[in-house]
Curated annotation (Swiss-Prot):
Primary localisation category: nucleus
SUPFAM superfamilies linked to this entry: beta-beta-alpha zinc fingers (SSF57667), KRAB domain (Kruppel-associated box) (SSF109640)
Family: Belongs to the krueppel C2H2-type zinc-finger protein family.
Stated name of the protein: Zinc finger protein 331
Name of the encoding gene: ZNF331
UniProt cross-link Glycyl lysine isopeptide (Lys-Gly) (interchain with G-Cter in SUMO2), position: 109, 400
Pfam family, one: zf-C2H2
Domain KRAB, first and last residues per copy: 6-78
Keywords linked to the UniProt accession: DNA-binding, Isopeptide bond, Metal-binding, Nucleus, Repeat, Transcription, Transcription regulation, Ubl conjugation, Zinc, Zinc-finger
Keyword Isomerase: no
Gene Ontology terms describing biological process: regulation of DNA-templated transcription
Keyword Zinc-finger listed: yes
Gene Ontology CC annotations of this record: nucleus
Zn finger intervals (C2H2-type): 131-153, 159-181, 187-209, 215-237, 243-265, 271-293, 299-321, 327-349, 355-377, 383-405, 411-433, 439-461
Length: 463
């Protein structure tokens, strides 16, 4: 009655010490269920083997093994230390009866060397990376890794959430996702009390307190708390952009940027403001938008004390103090503090207006102007005065309006000292000193120093 040994390293799943310690009892039970299922599937592939064995386990025995293993964690607690089980999969012989191949697992109990030691399989005998994907050529050291990887090509997502119908490629992804609906956060930081859905998130979070940054870039020496941060950072050195949009061909160095970009094509805006209902493509845009309602301006200039809702606004503002204008137009030589201003300016020379209103067809040379224009059609007035409740389409209009309540007149004439609340008022006033009359009537040639004076004059011709 010889039995042939079959390695199951290609279907085994190993956890590190750190990962195993983070699993709760339910997750460990799930692990054993998955392992048993994998073993059963492997054995079922060898139904044609004809051996003899009078001591094959019945289906009842298999269920007893499964039930016994599920209680292993609870039994280990009563013993005061952890026990782990080692499994050896053997190819059973077929008896003269009507037995089919079943799984023989010889569980050998032994105490763990350290608290929370994960289960270990026996030594592997196959070559590393011997399982290759026929679609992309990527190789794996285990068969189950290849099986999981192939779901990327097939698009198969067999694990569906009953709450929201979202589907996943792997069962552990579904388990983690379901915590979003239950609100379960079993992993709590002992230092600050912050709780997490997943143990891996807690492990990474703890590095904030310890200052540990184990992932270091070999090119520049910069260190990171997470491995994926290092991977993303290294693409700055290599220029690698692995993630390509199938709709327009644009490539990205980070997958989350591709996900956000795809929403431009799909029109999806999953992040909605509860105050005004406005929706956004990405969460960071919603956070920034909320500051309009709260008035929060966390980024303050150390030179003048002016505060901003976004850090890039502060960076741009600081160039006012330094006088820096590094972006110069090649057509006319005009220089700008910000690259975006140069791009917009160049459209004056080219006549390009890429931003078109779908309601009326009017086109603009920058997206911001289109966004503001669209509010004329929607009636949206997101900028509200806290003093009187008056609302405005544009933020600049609110700033100007607030000066009525504060009495601030920041625009002073250097000739006579007279101050104004708006810049255009000062510009018009200065013409009284210079004698400039820039508004000329096309009918009679008369010139005026104010646009409203020209309009009043033109009524003479119209009447």
């Amino acid at each position: 009655m010889a039995q042939g040994l079959v390695t199951f390293a290609d279907v085994a799943i190993d956890f590190s010490q750190e990962e195993w310690a983070c699993l709760n009892s339910a997750q460990r039970d799930l692990y054993w269920d998955v392992m048993l299922e994998n073993y059963s599937n492997l054995v079922s592939l060898d139904l044609e083997s004809a051996y003899e064995n009078k001591s094959l386990p019945t289906e009842k025995n298999i269920h007893e093994i499964r039930a016994s293993k599920r209680n292993s964690d609870r039994r280990s607690k009563s013993l005061g230390r952890n026990w782990i089980c080692e499994g050896m999969l053997e190819r059973p012989q077929r008896s003269r009866g009507r037995y089919v191949n079943q799984m023989i697992i010889n569980y050998v109990k032994r105490p763990a060397t350290r608290e929370g030691t994960p289960p270990r399989t026996h030594q592997r005998h196959h070559k590393e990376n011997s399982f290759e994907c026929k679609d992309c050529g990527k190789a794996f050291s285990r068969g189950y890794q290849l099986s999981q990887h192939q779901k990327i090509h097939t698009g198969e997502k067999p694990y569906e959430c009953k709450e929201c119908k979202k589907a996943f490629r792997w069962g552990n992804q579904l388990t983690q996702h379901q915590k979003i609906h239950t609100g379960e956060k079993p992993y709590e930081c002992k230092d600050c009390g912050k709780a997490f859905r997943w143990g891996s998130s807690l492990v990474i979070h703890k590095r904030i307190h310890t200052g540990e940054k184990p992932y270091e870039c070999k090119d520049c020496g910069k260190a990171f708390r997470r491995g994926d941060e290092l991977t993303q950072h290294q693409r700055f050195h290599t220029g690698e952009k692995d993630y390509e949009c199938k709709d327009c061909g644009k490539t990205f160095s980070r997958v989350y940027k591709l996900i956000q970009h795809k929403r431009i094509h799909s029109g999806e805006k999953p992040y909605e403001c509860k105050d005004c209902g406005k929706a956004f493509i990405c969460g960071s845009s919603l956070i920034q938008h909320k500051r309009i309602h709260t008035g929060e301006k966390p980024y303050e200039c150390q030179e003048c004390g002016k505060a901003f809702t976004r850090v890039n606004y502060l960076t741009q503002h600081q160039k006012i103090h330094t006088g820096e204008k590094p972006h110069e137009c090649k057509e006319c030589g005009k220089a700008f503090r910000w690259g975006s201003s140069l791009v917009k300016h160049e459209r004056i020379h080219t006549g390009e207006k890429p931003y078109k209103c779908t309601e009326c067809g009017k086109a603009f040379n920058c997206g911001y102007h289109l966004t503001q224009h669209e509010r004329i059609h929607t009636g949206e007035t997101p900028y509200k005065c806290k003093e009187c409740g008056k609302a405005f389409i544009y933020g600049s209009s609110l700033v100007k309006h607030e000066r009525i309540h504060t009495g601030v007149k920041p625009y002073g004439c250097t000739e006579c000292g007279k101050s104004f609340s708006h810049g255009h008022q000062l510009t018009q006033h200065q013409k009284t000193h210079s004698g400039a009359k820039s508004y000329e009537c096309k009918e009679c040639g008369k010139a005026c120093n104010h646009l409203n004076h020209l309009r009043e004059h033109q009524r003479i011709h119209n009447s």
